[in-house]
């Protein structure tokens, strides 16, 4: 779409993107080799109008210096992580920058050096400002326009706290169920104990959300089932992939943080406690 996009990468992925472009295999977009600018965090000296934060939750602290350096007075930062509360967390780390919050619905993974694969028909980005964040409607709509012109479904949220919690609830149930049983999502789509575990996790996070004062637009369990049933049957969560490879994973943010938050609110989470025994 002709947008000026820069990727921050490192190691063999950076070398591959610089040498061969970013290789994209996509059920939605087809096969592409994208010639995109790529730098290490240390090399990048430019200023960005919009910064999408796509690292895993455990790496957020490592990018704060880059965000500070790459921001100008009108920059907006949009985290699209899986873990709830990321926007306020980054805002505390970079108080001089406008940080929104967001989440993304997509099944994608790194399939090789400088190569990503997107599966299925889901690709939607949701973002918005927390109540204490001052940002103009014009800025929010400008970001939406750029995303839509790039073929991305983009929604401006009127309650980003709710929408990021809903995403956390979904991805937590998906990743934890998949990792606990070591199965792809096709097994969650069938009636039986795997699907029942997914439902139990969804019910428990929904109870936590209600206790936190979040007003859901629809039943969160039905919503999570609707999303899971749309996924390609062979898809797995990134936490699952990382654990299978012995890599660092998001198990803290997607499993143990949910249990901690429930404890703080006096919510009983028997299904979460059951699956947590496997990962202690």
Regions found by a protein language model. Name each.
Residues 31-115:
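Rossmann-like NAD(P)(H) cofactor-binding subdomain of soluble oxidoreductases
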Residues 1-30:
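NAD(P)+-binding Rossmann beta1-loop-alpha1 motif at the extreme N-terminus of oxidoreductases
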Residues 22-39, 171:
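N-terminal glycine-rich dinucleotide-binding loop that anchors FAD/FMN and/or NAD(P) in oxidoreductases
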Residues 71-74, 116-130, 179-188, 235-245:
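Helix-loop-beta segment of a Rossmann-like dinucleotide-binding subdomain
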Residues 46, 82-163, 167:
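Rossmann-fold dinucleotide-binding core
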Residues 161-189, 193-206, 232-233:
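Active-site-proximal catalytic alpha-helix in oxidoreductases
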Residues 148-149, 199-280:
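NAD(P)-dependent Rossmann-like dehydrogenase/reductase catalytic/cofactor-binding core
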């Amino acid at each position: 779409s002709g947008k000026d996009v820069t990727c921050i990468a490192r190691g063999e992925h950076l070398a591959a993107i610089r040498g061969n472009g970013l290789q994209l295999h996509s059920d939605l977009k087809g096969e592409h080799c994208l010639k995109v600018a790529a730098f290490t965090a240390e090399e990048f000296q430019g200023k960005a109008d919009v910064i999408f934060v796509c690292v895993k939750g455990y790496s957020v602290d490592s990018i704060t210096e880059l965000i500070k350096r790459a921001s100008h007075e009108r920059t907006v930062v949009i985290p699209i992580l899986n873990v709830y509360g990321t926007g306020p967390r980054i805002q505390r780390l970079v108080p001089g920058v406008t940080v929104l919050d967001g989440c993304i619905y997509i099944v994608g993974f790194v399939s090789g050096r400088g190569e990503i694969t997107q599966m299925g028909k889901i690709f939607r980005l949701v973002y918005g400002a927390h109540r204490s964040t001052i940002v103009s409607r014009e800025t929010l709509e400008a970001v939406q326009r750029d995303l839509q012109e790039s073929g991305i479904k983009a929604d401006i949220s009127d309650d980003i706290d709710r929408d990021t919690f809903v995403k956390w609830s979904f991805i937590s149930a998906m990743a934890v169920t998949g990792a606990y049983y070591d199965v792809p999502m096709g097994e969650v789509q069938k009636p039986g104990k795997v699907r029942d575990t997914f439902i139990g996790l969804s019910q428990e996070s929904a109870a936590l959300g209600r206790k936190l004062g979040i007003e859901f637009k629809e039943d969160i369990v039905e919503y999570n089932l609707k999303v899971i049933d749309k996924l390609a049957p062979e898809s797995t969560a990134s936490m699952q992939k990382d654990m299978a490879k012995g890599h660092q994973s998001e198990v803290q943010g997607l499993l143990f943080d949910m249990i901690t938050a429930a404890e703080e609110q006096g919510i009983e989470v028997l299904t979460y406690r059951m699956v947590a025994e496997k990962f202690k």
